[in-house]
From Swiss-Prot:
This is Actin cytoskeleton-regulatory complex protein SLA1. Keywords: Actin-binding, Cell membrane, Cytoplasm, Cytoskeleton, Endocytosis, Endosome, Isopeptide bond, Membrane, Phosphoprotein, Repeat, SH3 domain, Ubl conjugation. Residues 130-248, 415-497, 558-592, 610-649, 726-791, 813-853 are annotated as: Disordered. Component of the PAN1 actin cytoskeleton-regulatory complex required for the internalization of endosomes during actin-coupled endocytosis. The complex links the site of endocytosis to the cell membrane-associated actin cytoskeleton. Mediates uptake of external molecules and vacuolar degradation of plasma membrane proteins. Plays a role in the proper organization of the cell membrane-associated actin cytoskeleton and promotes its destabilization. It is a peripheral membrane protein. PANTHER family: ACTIN CYTOSKELETON-REGULATORY COMPLEX PROTEIN SLA1, FCH AND DOUBLE SH3 DOMAINS PROTEIN. GO terms for biological process: actin cortical patch assembly; endocytosis; regulation of actin filament polymerization.
Length: 1244
């Protein structure tokens, strides 16, 4: 659908007042783009004919325009569906009727479709006038009865008086209000102001004028938007014709005196343009004439103009004298040039070129995506037949599908009727430009001024000009477009006028040259009078000028002044004659060359047509030409019956190759192609013995067909050179030289097939393919050898094939084996003077002897201990009691999963270590050992000096061990090193003299060993200490994991934080006090209890509230040491005791642990005596970890203030054990009490 809502005509001229408005002139044709609903201003586009011009768009008052009248009706003779500009062109079908509004451009008509009521353009050569075209009266009636655009238009009954002319409506967007349209200045081309415009005619009166108004049109050769009127409209107006002719070129000559510049030379010359020709006449030299299409380029720069012509080639640089003249010449050249190369003409030419049609002769099946499947009898459009002579791009008429088709399958159809109608349409459009105008006589007389011109036509032209007095006539595109108010005479163009002098020199006249005929020179004087002067009366200079203009010799009219002048003139004329002869010869040579090329092309085309017709006469599908992309494709064409083919071939004297190929076993679809190739190469029957593989391959035969043909020829001529070959001989990969399929036999079996055992397998019983079989050479899988076939009947033959035929076994998924523990991590720690090394356990695969079961198992599965990559080392993290170390009992290490175990006032559980139970060190209560993360398991041995116990720390002002993670400088201590003991101040402090360990200094109290995780000096189970200093109050142990503990007052309590910043925000920090080496007591009303947190900020806001956030938070809200709370996390038992300050007077707390069975008897009793005589302890710790009743092993007694009691038992080794923390299998050693020593109490 187009964008045009209607076609309107300007009734009055309008000058725009704002930039968005459009200037229009009377009778301008307008396309309506948009109607306004709020005011009377409509958006229109003005019709301008020309290739380089842009049609302006703007607002106009709706009262100044009306619907354009219909000139005539036309009917479509062809379908037009492929529009190039859908916004302006209409699609239509044959026999559609249109109302024509404008036909000034004969190639594109502005119409309205009576079918769809759409407005737009249609190609002029696609339509023809409808029978019984509209008469002048009907046109006048249609023009008068056309509805007015707005109610402001004049009524149909009466003519609008000039005094009733309405001003245009006010624009809403106008900045200032206009007083009245009547006050606007009239256009200089108009007769008067808008109110003085005559009323529109009615149907009953002034029929002729209405017809004139309806038919009047304007030529639009100017490419300037301001060229809105044409002075020659009325001059070329023909009231007796229904069709207004559109003259393409202005036949009036324009000439200017210019100066030609050649380097530094300047030559005077004259430039004339008219009748579609450009004449350049130098003052001295040969004049040149070119048609407007020979002008290749034209340009100007101020006063200079540059023209370039071809045929003959000439480049001119002209100086016009002033800028106005240069611009005038450029505009006139632009008019002629634009009219000659109007793109509308090219569009019509492309549209008029109908698509080349063709009829499919044979069926063709597409074998690739770019090919098109066609059937015999289909009609196709041949889109491209030049890119390839063998493959044409075609489009099916019915479905519209396009693709490549073999050219020989298509028969082009030459639509003579369509071609003739197209050509006739173009010829008619050309004839309209020149035959429908009364100016044809003047155009013809001027275009043939160099031939036998008729002065009667010139007089007729003068009469026409006289009759057209008072009408507008266009002189040039840059003239002022002014009308001659007193146009009683037609005056000559002053720029073309020159001074004419008679031969005597007496008379001189300023006139314009019109023409020359019958010995007379016709001149147009400056006063408007036209005269005819005898040629023999004019001077020789004037005659020479006429010769230059017309190109004819006037020697017989010139005066014979002397022999020299005659000789000069004769030489010039001879030179001119030779030049013209030379040009004529060049043109003739070019013409002959073009004709020869056309003849050769025509001859080649005829040869192709003959070849195609010869192939079609055979009534056989032609050969499909090979394509580069498909080397093995076979054209699937409809097969021709063999009988018909043979009968046709038998009619000639040629050998029937088709039957030959059929006898050879070639497929029928390929027989025809091979037959045509053999016929083209003129192969006869007597050439059969000479046919070989290379010849057949050259002729396009396939490899399989080559073998078939050669076998047939060998059989026919009895050639035995490739007779039977032994069975063990090899041919090519799939066949033997005799043509039979290759049957591979094993080297050891060379027996004939008759001697081989016969089986009933289909593969073995299949007979060998004979030479006569048609499908012998089709692609088949390679045949199995006899040996392989026979071997499949038996299970195994002992050959390599048995191994190849075996299927791979599916591996069974083995159960996840228990990882071997790292034995280095399980190396025991000694507390005596002798180190008993652990027996090495092989990490090889498990032996036949099963590993002993774990007697302390707490679950239902017998799961051996696993090593998870690290060994958990014991550490102490809190408790308000000073750590006291016991060196005479069993040390029971404990490992935890995911939870940090703390004991602050209870008894540690006992776990299996080897074959016995070893209680862990007890320092002020049962200490739960803690594991280390990311640190090597380095267990330092307890030290024995003189067989007695070594007090590691005194009980006053002790500093608790610190444990830190990710501290640089990791240096692990070797296990089993003996640390000497030093006594400083109040207690003995062990030191390591075997490795570089920092010494520990104490300045205010006794230091307790520190445990560091990842620190270069680590001590997790012995008496070795890192380098903390105690300079004031007692320091509680700190354990930090990438965190900075803060304390705001008093003694620092142990803190354990993982990526958190513990803060103490309340409660008084009570300093530790040392009272004579006895146990320091703490005030429980505000003393801070150690906090252990993972990734959280633990705060103590008052009172006595220990927290453990290793997956569990324990709180105590008051009182003294509650009962212990037991936690089970991850399969290991974690015991946390968060009791307060340990009482020294007969504690009554008993901690009992049962994790796997019934309640067991207590195994250990730990007694503390921190001052005075030994009191009866009331605290009993009972452990049961496996359901087996354990006997009490020992009683640990500490006396730190009174008499030292003798230990009841030698100190045993500290074994790191636990469920899942890298503990290896149980050792197979046995205890022997007879071999027991101080360092080996069980006698392993």
């Amino acid at each position: 659908m187009t964008v045009f809502l209607g076609i309107y005509r300007a009734v009055y001229a309008y000058e725009p007042q704002t930039p968005e408005e459009l200037a229009i002139q009377e009778d301008d044709l307008l396309y309506l783009l948009q109607k306004s609903d709020i005011d009377d201003w409509w958006t229109v586009k003005k019709r301008v004919i020309g290739s380089d011009s842009e049609e302006p768009v703007g607002l106009v008052p709706s009262t100044y325009i009306e619907e354009a009248p219909v000139l005539k009706k036309v009917r479509a003779i062809y379908d037009y569906e492929q529009v190039q500009n859908a916004d302006e062109e209409l699609t239509f079908h044959e026999n559609d009727v249109f109302d024509v509004f404008d036909d000034k451009d004969a190639d594109w008509l502005l119409v309205k479709s009576t079918v769809s009521n759409e407005f737009g353009f249609i190609p002029g050569n696609y339509v023809e006038p409808e029978n019984g075209s509209t008469s002048k009266q009907e046109q006048a009636a249609a023009a008068a009865e056309a509805p007015a655009a707005t109610p402001a238009a004049a009524p149909a009954s009466a003519a609008v008086l000039p005094t009733n002319f309405l001003p245009p409506p006010q624009h809403n967007d106008r900045a200032r209000m206009m007083q009245s349209k009547e006050d606007q200045a009239p256009d200089e081309d108009e007769e008067g102001p808008p109110p003085a415009m005559p009323a529109r005619p009615t149907a009953t009166t002034e029929t002729t004028d209405a017809t004139a108004a309806a038919v009047r049109s304007r030529t639009r050769l100017s490419y300037s938007d301001n060229d809105n009127d044409d002075e020659e409209d009325d001059y070329y107006y023909n009231s007796n014709s229904n069709n207004v002719g559109n003259h393409e070129y202005n036949t009036e000559y324009h000439s200017w005196n210019v100066t030609e510049i050649e380097g530094r030379k300047k030559k005077k010359a004259k430039l004339s343009i008219g009748n579609n020709k450009i004449n350049f006449i130098p003052q001295k030299g040969t004049p040149h004439e070119w048609s407007i299409d020979k002008l290749v380029s034209y340009d100007n720069e101020k006063k200079h103009m540059f023209l370039e012509f071809v045929d003959p080639y000439r480049s001119l640089e002209l100086h016009t004298g002033n800028t106005t003249t240069c611009e005038e010449i450029m505009n006139i050249i632009g008019e002629y040039k634009g009219a000659s190369r109007d793109p509308g003409l090219r569009e019509v030419e492309m549209a008029s070129k109908s698509k080349k049609r063709g009829i499919v002769q044979y069926d063709f099946m597409a074998e690739s995506q770019d090919e098109l499947t066609i059937k015999s009898g289909d009609k196709v459009y041949i889109l491209d037949d030049k890119k390839s002579k063998d493959w044409w791009m075609c489009q099916l008429v019915d479905s519209g599908k396009s693709g490549l088709v073999p050219a020989q399958f298509i028969e082009p159809v030459r639509d003579k009727k369509h071609t003739e109608s197209t050509a006739s349409g173009i010829i008619k459009s050309i004839k309209k430009n020149f035959t429908k105008s009364p100016s044809r006589s003047r155009s013809r007389s001027r275009s043939k001024s160099n031939a036998n011109a008729s002065w009667k036509d010139d007089e007729l032209q003068n009469d026409v000009v006289g009759s057209a007095a008072g009408k507008r006539s266009r002189k040039s595109s840059l003239s002022s477009h002014k009308k001659n108010s007193s146009a009683t005479k037609d005056f000559p163009n002053p720029k073309k006028s020159r001074l004419w002098v008679d031969r005597s020199g007496t008379f001189k006249v300023d006139a314009e040259f019109i023409g020359c005929a019958k010995g007379k020179i016709h001149l147009h004087k400056a006063n408007g009078v036209k005269i005819a002067v005898a040629a023999d009366k004019l001077s020789n200079e004037d005659l020479a000028y006429v010769e230059k203009i017309t190109g004819f010799s006037l020697e017989k009219f010139k005066a014979n002044d002397g022999s020299s002048s005659r000789g000069t003139d004769s030489r010039d004329s001879e030179r001119e004659r030779r030049r013209r002869l030379k040009e004529q010869e060049e043109k003739e040579r070019d013409r002959r060359l073009k004709e020869r090329e056309l003849y050769e092309l025509k001859k080649a085309r005829e040869l192709l047509d003959e070849e195609r017709s010869r192939l079609q006469e055979k009534e056989l599908p032609p050969i499909k030409p090979p394509r580069p992309t498909s080397t093995t494709s076979v054209p699937n064409t409809t097969s021709v019956p063999p009988a018909e083919s043979s009968n046709n071939n038998n009619s000639s004297n040629k050998y029937d190759w088709f039957e030959f190929f059929l006898n050879c076993g070639v497929d029928v679809s390929n027989c025809q192609r091979y037959t045509i190739n053999f016929d083209r190469e003129q192969l006869t029957e007597d050439m059969m013995p000479d046919i070989n593989n290379s010849m057949l391959r050259t002729l396009g035969l396939r490899e399989g067909d080559i073998v078939r043909v050669m076998k047939h020829l060998d059989k026919k001529f009895g050639r035995e050179n490739i007779a039977s070959i032994p069975t063990n001989a090899t041919g090519n990969m799939f066949s033997q030289p005799d043509g039979s399929l290759n049957v591979a036999t094993s080297p050891e079996t060379s027996l004939p097939q008759q001697l081989l055992p016969q089986t009933t397998s289909p593969a073995q019983t299949a007979p060998s393919t004979s030479a006569e079989t048609d499908d012998a050479w089709t692609v088949k899988p390679a045949s199995k050898s006899e040996s392989n076939l026979l071997s499949k009947k038996s299970e195994f033959t002992g050959s390599m094939q048995d191994l190849l035929d075996l299927q791979p076994l599916e591996p069974k998924k083995a159960a996840a084996s228990t990882p071997e523990p790292n034995l280095k991590d399980l190396e025991p720690v000694k507390t005596g003077g002798t180190t008993v090394p652990a027996a090495p356990v092989s990490s090889a695969p498990v032996s036949s002897a099963p590993a002993p079961l774990d007697p302390f198992k707490t679950g239902g599965n017998n799961i051996l201990p696993l090593s998870t990559g690290f060994v958990m080392m014991p550490m102490i993290t809190g408790g308000a009691m000073l750590p006291m170390q016991r060196t005479g009992g069993f040390v029971v290490p404990q490992t935890t999963f995911g939870m940090q175990s703390q004991v602050t006032g209870g008894i540690l559980p006992v776990q299996k270590t080897g074959n016995g139970l070893i209680p862990i060190s007890n320092t002020g209560g049962a200490m739960m050992p803690q594991t280390t993360f990311g640190a090597a398991a380095t267990v330092l041995p307890l030290q024995k000096t003189g067989g007695g116990l070594i007090p590691i720390a005194t009980t006053g002002g002790a500093q608790f061990p610190q444990t830190s993670f990710n501290v640089q400088g990791q240096q692990q201590l070797p296990t089993g090193s003996i640390l000497p003991v030093q006594k400083t101040a109040n207690g003995l402090i062990s030191a390591n003299t075997g490795v570089s360990m920092p010494t520990v200094q104490r300045t205010g109290g006794t230091m307790i060993p520190q445990t560091s995780f990842g620190v270069s000096q680590q001590l997790t189970g012995g008496a070795m200490m890192t380098q903390p200093q105690n300079t004031g109050s007692a320091m509680m142990p700190q354990t930090s994991f990438n965190a900075v503990p803060q304390i705001t007052g008093g003694a620092m309590m142990p803190q354990t934080s993982f990526n958190a910043l513990p803060q103490v925000t309340g409660g008084a920090m009570m300093p530790l006090q040392r009272t004579g080496g006895a146990l320091n007591t703490f005030n429980t009303g505000g003393a801070m209890i150690p906090q252990t947190s993972f990734s959280s900020q633990a705060q103590n806001t008052g009172g006595f509230r220990p927290q453990s956030q290793f997956g569990l938070t324990l709180q105590k809200t008051g009182g003294i040491a509650p009962l212990n709370q037991n936690q089970f996390t991850g399969g290991a038992m974690n015991t946390l005791s968060t009791g307060g300050v340990l009482q020294q007077q007969q504690p009554q707390t008993m901690n009992t642990f049962n994790t796997g069975g019934v309640m067991q008897q207590p195994q250990m009793m730990t007694t503390f005596n921190t001052g005075g005589a030994m009191q009866q302890p009331q605290m009993m710790n009972t452990f049961n970890t496996g359901g087996i009743m354990q006997q009490p092993q020992m009683m640990n007694t500490f006396n730190t203030g009174g008499a030292m009691q003798q230990p009841q038992q030698q100190a045993l080794q500290n074994q790191p054990t636990g469920f899942g923390f890298g503990n290896g299998p149980q050792q197979s050693r046995q205890a022997n009490i007879f071999n027991a020593t101080a360092s080996n109490p069980f006698g392993f």
